[in-house]
Every structure is written in C-alpha cells, then in structure tokens.
Curated annotation (Swiss-Prot):
The gene is potA. GO terms for cellular component: ATP-binding cassette (ABC) transporter complex. InterPro entries: AAA+_ATPase, ABC_SmlMolc_Importer, ABC_transporter-like_ATP-bd, ABC_transporter-like_CS, Mo/tungstate-bd_C_term_dom, P-loop_NTPase, PotA-like, PotA_ATP-bd. SMART domains: AAA. This is Spermidine/putrescine import ATP-binding protein PotA. ATP binds at G49, P50, S51, G52, C53, G54, K55, T56. GO terms for molecular function: ABC-type putrescine transporter activity; ATP binding; ATP hydrolysis activity. It catalyses: ATP + H2O + polyamine-[polyamine-binding protein]Side 1 = ADP + phosphate + polyamineSide 2 + [polyamine-binding protein]Side 1. It comes from Mycobacterium sp. (strain KMS). It is an enzyme of class 7 (translocase).
C-alpha cells in the first residue's frame, strides 16, 4: 500500500513517522519545543492537549503545511522536513470535510485515484473497497447534502484513504458533530483504522476521544510533550501533575515524601497523616516536596474505621451530588485539603449530610506520588477546556 516520497523508496522496517528533536518558533513564540518521538506502522496515535499546546502545529509539520525551525521529520525513513505537502504520502482530514457538493459519494471518493491517472478498473476496485469499509455502499449515488454528518465524515475518510497513504492525519474531525454522534463515530473511526491498517495520527483536546480510540497518546502542554503512553498508562501512571489533572479527574494533594518503605512503596506526609503510596517514575528525595494523586473512583467512604492495608484519613462531608451512575462526594480533610470521591450508586452508601465525619480510604496501589507542582483549581481547568 505504501508509495514513494519524492521519488525515494520508503524504508518499511522502521517507524512510519519520526519526530526528531523538532522545535517550531513563530518569531519569539515557541509553539513546539524539542519534540522527540516516533509513531509505528498501523498505530492509532493521538496528540492531546489544551489550546496552544502545540498539537496542531506538530500535525501541520507532519503534513508539510509548516516547516520545523530545527530538527527533522522523517516519513518511512526519508527526511521530509522541507518536502512540500503534495509530495508526502500522507492525507489530512479536517473538521470541515470539504466534500464536492455537486459530486456523488462514489465520485467524491474516486477523485484521488482519478487525479493520479489510475485506470478505471483500479479506481472502481479502490472506491468499492473503501465504501464497503466505511459502510456506505448503499449511499454511493447520493450527494453529500443528502447525508447525515456522520455519513459525510465517513465519505471524507474514504476519500482520504483511497490513495493508500502511509499515514492519515486527523485534525479534530469530530468537532462539528453533536455529542451522541461524536461518541458513535469514535468507535467507527477505530474500527475503520483497524480494518485498513493505516497509521492514524489524531489531534484532539477531548480526553474521552483520545482514551477511547488510541493505541498511544502524546499529552502536550505549552509546546512540550509531557508524556507518551497507552491510555491505561496515561490514566493510571501519569508522569506529571498536569497529565493527572488533564486526563480524567484526580485528587491532588501537596505534601512531603518522608522516605521509602520498601522497593514498592514510599511514605508521604499529606492530609495531616503519614500514608503509604506508590512511587512515580520520577525519583523524589526523602523530605522533598511531592504531590499525591488518587482518582475519585478509587476512594471508599465509610462511617467505621477501615481495616487492612489501606491508606485512610478522617474527612468532613461538604456536599453530595447525584450524577447518575455515581454519587459525587465533596469532602474536606483535617488540613483543609479538598477531597472528591465518586461512589457507585450500587454501593450501600450511608445516609450522609453536610458536616458528617467519615473515613475516606483507598488502597496504596491506587495512589501515585508525583513531583511537586502547582495544582490547578477547578476554575483553571474549566478555562483551559473552554479555550480548547
């Protein structure tokens, strides 16, 4: 399926895309700072972050719409940093699909191979194959205006895939769809990517999209790549406070790491108690400032003191909010730190009122000690997402 780039045969043994210490400046503004990672063949790779983090600039450099200030971008082993977009074997799908309104679905998809002077039988084979993959065979004769938003999205995908690119670049393509359709299209995109086996590079600020579809995620912030990993790695073992806060919801409490208990656990002085916790990947010296992270759904709340190998603190109930499958408990620790717990509605939660004293506990394996950092407030996060 892979073709040549600027007349040079691709190296199929290495990664499809290599971002080699790439920096992009616009005057004095650093949009991307020393990005260094690779993307494997057949991988669904997402770049995730708030507005201004550098994800779209990185995608535009891969596509050829921007040129790196320094570093190199390689496509199947060939340096394409200064190769124009039309000579790179990649295609891009944007939020606005730019389908030809006067052409049928079939002719829209056929536009690419026809422009490459493929013979009629090859054009038919490719178009029919892609329409079957995106499940639009029965809509081949319709015009784009006769399709739903999700169907138009799939036409745009088929048109971008029909020339067999080495990688498909997707710049927030689901942003124009309503919430329910956007959720459905997440699973459709992943299904299509698995069927065609082509590398997808996906840009989004939506953490749910990235977690649902991706094989790996690069979380970006202020031009820097904060962490690259699988969705499970990113969620369960975030490398920084920013990643922990941006991916899902997290309790983040400032404290001091007092020492190492054994190979697997450390002790951290936080929430007015000394608690057993998992160390993160960044070493922190004894006595050093640190941040303890625990996800709200990993907390348990009870009126009775917990037993067994658990971390536990006393807390005071501030508020309870019913949110369908969970009850959101807002609590405060003895040192006035806020605690948020998500308790499944199927659990036998005691009847609680604001002001009640409870025990909040969790397994040490559910916690993670991260390097100390400023902890964003709820207002900071809402502003960040609004700007995205």
């Amino acid at each position: 399926m892979n073709q040549t780039v600027d007349g040079v045969a691709p190296n199929k043994s290495g990664p499809v895309i290599e971002i080699d210490h790439v920096t992009k400046r616009f005057a004095d503004y650093v949009a991307v700072a020393d990005a260094d990672f690779s993307i494997a063949s057949g991988e669904f790779f997402s770049m995730l972050g708030p507005s201004g983090c550098g994800k779209t600039t990185t995608l535009r450099m891969i596509a050829g719409f921007e040129t790196p200030t320094s570093g190199a971008i390689r496509l199947e082993g060939t340096d394409v940093s200064r190769v124009p977009p039309h000579k790179r074997n990649v295609n891009t799908v944007f939020q606005h699909y730019a389908l030809f309104p006067h052409m049928s679905v079939w002719d829209n998809v056929a536009y690419g191979p026809r422009s490459m002077k493929k013979d009629k039988s090859e054009v038919k084979r490719r178009v029919d194959e892609l329409l079957e993959v995106v499940r639009l065979t029965d809509f081949a004769k319709r015009k784009p205006g006769q399709l739903s938003g999700g169907q138009q999205q799939r036409v745009a995908l088929a048109r971008a895939l029909v020339n067999y690119p080495s990688a498909l670049l997707l710049d927030e393509p689901l942003g124009a769809l309503d919430l329910k359709l956007r959720h459905a299209m997440q699973f459709e995109l992943k299904r299509i990517q698995r069927e065609v086996g082509i590398t997808f590079i996906y840009v989004t600020h939506d953490q749910e999209e990235a977690l649902t579809m991706s094989d790996r995620i690069a979380v970006m912030n202020a031009g820097n790549v904060e962490q690259i990993g699988t969705p499970t790695d990113i969620y369960d073992r975030p490398a920084t406070v920013f990643v922990a806060n941006f991916i899902g919801q997290a309790n983040l409490w400032s404290g001091r790491q007092t020492g190492r208990l054994n190979r697997d656990y450390v002790e951290i002085d936080v929430l007015g108690s000394k608690l057993k916790a998992r160390p993160g990947d960044t070493a922190i010296e004894a006595g050093g400032h640190a941040t303890l992270m625990v996800r709200p759904e990993r907390l348990r709340v009870s009126m009775e003191p917990p037993v067994g190998d658990v971390a536990a603190v006393r807390a005071t109930v501030r508020d309870m909010t019913f949110q369908g499958p969970v009850v959101r408990l807002s609590l405060v620790a003895p040192d006035d730190s806020p605690i948020v717990a998500h308790v499944g509605t199927e659990q036998q939660l005691p009847l609680l009122r604001p002001g009640d004293e409870v025990y909040v506990c969790w397994s040490p394996d559910a916690s993670l000690v991260l390097p100390a950092a400023d902890i964003p407030t709820t207002e900071d996060l809402e502003e960040m997402l609004d700007e995205s």
